[in-house]
Amino acid sequence: MSGPNRTYSFGEGDDGLAHPSSRTHAMHSQYDDVSPISDGARMNPMNGQGTDHGLASVPEDGHQGWGRGPEPSPSILTGSSATPGMDNLGPGAVGGGISGIALSVANSHDRLSGVEALMGTDGQEANIPAERGFSTTGSDNPYVPAPPEHRYSYGSNIALGAAAAPAGQLTPGQSVSHLSSSNPSQRNLYDIPYQGAGGLNAGPYQRHSAYSSNDLPVDINPDEIVDDGDDGFVPAPNSSSSARKSQAIPAAAGGAAAGGFLGNLGGLFGGKSAADTSYGPVPGAGLEAGEKGRWVKPKPGGGSKKRGWIVGAILAFIIIGAIVGGAVGGTIGHRGNEEPSSASSSSSSSTQTATDDTSTNGDLDKNSAEIKALMNNKNLHKVFPGIDYTPWGVQYPLCLKYPPSQNNVTRDMAVLTQLTNNVRLYGTDCNQTEMVLHAIDKLEIKDMKIWLGVWIDSNITTSRRQIDQLYKIIDDAKDTSIFNGAIVGNEALYRAGSDKTSAQTTLINYMQEVKDHFKKKNIDLPVATSDLGDNWDATLVQAADVVMANVHPFFGGIPVDQAAAWTWQFWQDHNVALTKGTNKKQVISEVGWPSGGGNDCGLGANCPNDTAGAVAGVDELNKFMEDWVCQALENGTDYFWFEAFDEPWKIVYNTANENWEDKWGLMDAARNLKPGLKIPDCGGKTATR
């Protein structure tokens, strides 16, 4: 899942295969035998009404007019090489900046403690909600970008966090229209269809955060700050075209850093080195923009603003210091903190660090009482071909100060092994892959496989660090048969905005580099990337060994009784059709449904009533699983479920009417199955890999 306002179009892709005039229903061809949907009424994707044509397809007349706003020029911002989202604490602003975030943490995360309470408080983007709420890599982070343009078809107002635009794709208060309405399948990350929504923008499925504030009192020159672009302190731009401005205010308290930013309009992958100094509204900069840029000079009257900033900074340090003070001991985000006594031990202490956990409980294994309890849940069934997973606390560089807990990963894997034999990761930072491998070894799981993940960022340093770590993991592995393949980038093209072509070239180069390394080491593993279903085209299909598409019916505003059919047909029309005549495998790399938080009518929480569109809830989640899981299992439809565990820290991305960001898990953060939720047992049939 990626950033906000992710929409699904029924128009053509780059190669035209999905155009109404040329696209055929794959469902009526060789794909009839893989539909996970039983016969029934076919739904009309445009009006949500069923017809008597079965559940097969979506009408071909999907093109609609798309509303567009004024077109200010995008700015080239600075891309951070820090793991998206979790390395930044909020908008740099007086009053409403660090201090505001600090108070928000104290008020909204009262159940959590220390750094755990800080997780996800990477900032606010006025009026724009985060998609999945992932501001970090992988399924644990909503990679939240600025939303795409406003449109009147199936839209996911919120891109699922793990996959959204990189930090700061938007200059606040502006809307930009870069793409022709004749190609609605392309996402525009610069429009703001949520005016007045008061939402948060970050970015997921992963997934980057953008921040803005309505009254930031001072301009800060980042050239005066020592910053190598890889520490999570990301400067934000000053936009003269908007009353709203963003500042970067680096601060530290007890090892925690706060930095407000509007990241990198200037480059998803093709960023220049940190030495480059290009900044400003440069049309078409996109992927080719520099990673660092000069700021405009402060406006007259900056003296009073500076005094206001100093006062605000002092207050901010006091408040942040008080909050983070409780984390100085190294408190980590520990799912075990809220575990029931039946499935926990003394490791559940809310004040334990990773080191404390290991000292108290040792290196947990299959014989540990806590693990035995976790692995004996009769309500869990191994019916999912794959599950998206990001371990708790693997956000770089915060993990250098507060390392994630190996025992927490082992606990997670003890649960996941009862749901699937196939886990997908989103990145390589903070030893997350190594910890998963260690957990599998300690639990003596023989049939678990891993899809390696590599987070591709706008900052070359980040991407290089991730890829180099992938090579180390592969080269150090005693047996590479545990790996199913490597996924290089998640929704990278979606986050590229109008620079999709340039981004695709860079992404393909990264994929080819990984392929070459595998070949050199005589490693036979597929290399793929994952992106929105309608961001795939023939060129990308040719470069990837597997076509992996993220498809979320909830953000399409699809009523749950039609969601399974819509998901399958969308995938067939936009992805499976592209592989015709090839031996390419197709996988739905993300699909799921939130257990609460409101309803989405395709363009956010703008529904006429609380029962319209896609409604989040346990009953609806049960219905979607009932219609999808066993049928997909029976017919061999390959997919990854998003996701196993709730992510409470993502509550910061919720808005008044969109409160689903932290509710995508089958289980809560303490690994308890949600009340009323029923995972289908599919008559005893289990997923095998």
UniProtKB/Swiss-Prot annotation:
Its EC number is 3.2.1.39. The chain crosses the membrane at residues 308-328. One of its GO terms (cellular component) is extracellular region. Belongs to the glycosyl hydrolase 17 family. Gene3D superfamilies: Glycosidases. Residues 1-307 are cytoplasmic. Disulfide bonds: none annotated. Glucanases play a role in cell expansion during growth, in cell-cell fusion during mating, and in spore release during sporulation. This enzyme may be involved in beta-glucan degradation. Active on laminarin and lichenan. The active site is at 491 (proton donor), 590 (nucleophile). The keyword Transmembrane applies. InterPro entries: Beta-glucan_modifiers, Glycoside_hydrolase_SF. GO terms for biological process: cell wall organization; polysaccharide catabolic process. GO terms for molecular function: glucan endo-1,3-beta-D-glucosidase activity. The keyword Calcium does not apply. This is Probable glucan endo-1,3-beta-glucosidase btgC. Glycans are attached at residues 408, 431, 459, 609, 635. Residues 175-188 have a biased composition (Polar residues). It comes from Neosartorya fischeri (strain ATCC 1020 / DSM 3700 / CBS 544.65 / FGSC A1164 / JCM 1740 / NRRL 181 / WB 181). It is found in: Cell membrane. It is a single-pass type II membrane protein. Residues 1-91, 128-147, 169-195, 334-365 are annotated as: Disordered. Residues 341-360 have a biased composition (Low complexity). Its main location: membrane.
